[in-house]
Amino acid sequence: MSAKIILVFCAQALFVQSALSQCTSRATVAADRGIIGGYGLGAPYGLAYGLEAPLGLGYGLGAPCGLGGPAIDITPTIGGGLPVSSASAIAPVGLAVASENVYEGILAAAGELPFVGTVGVEGVLPTAGAGAVHHSCGNGINAMASRDAAFAPGYAGAYGIGLGAYGLGVPALEVPALGYRAGWRGCGCGL
């Protein structure tokens, strides 16, 4: 009788684990335990993929999660930036940015929200001013855009001189002769 109870208990535990669990690799668990994990040199997936792969050392040194990522202290704006990053194996389910500040003068705000972003402008706008919200998804078409991690140091991307999303790398290399996003992990030239 006790053997049946133990067998049923173990079977229930197996069913609960299989129903409520997520399959992740051991690299995420190992990276979060050492000096190279989390927000260290190999964030978030360790050094297993090598120096040039987007999830290895290159990702840790050039992305917002790693050693040289842009931080509030070095952002070249007045009032600091709003860096939002996730080094988790689980995708974030939502991001909300709300502000009830009063802005006077010319205001230009640009950024990217993950997957689907909703922007709203409410309140009284002066008659001499204008307010506009431009929303796009992907590269101007209704699709998801896939971008690789930056391989330059993180501070270079903040000033527009790096290979990151704000520098020379992504828009300049999207030419048909070199393939889509020629460079690291592109579809053309075997790069």
From Swiss-Prot:
One of its GO terms (cellular component) is egg chorion. GO terms for biological process: chorion-containing eggshell formation. Residues 1-21 form the signal peptide. One of its GO terms (molecular function) is structural constituent of egg chorion. It comes from the Eukaryota. Keywords: Repeat, Signal. It holds the Pfam family Chorion_1. This protein is one of many from the eggshell of the gypsy moth. Belongs to the chorion protein family. This is Chorion class B protein Ld34. The lineage of its organism: Eukaryota, Metazoa, Ecdysozoa, Arthropoda, Hexapoda.
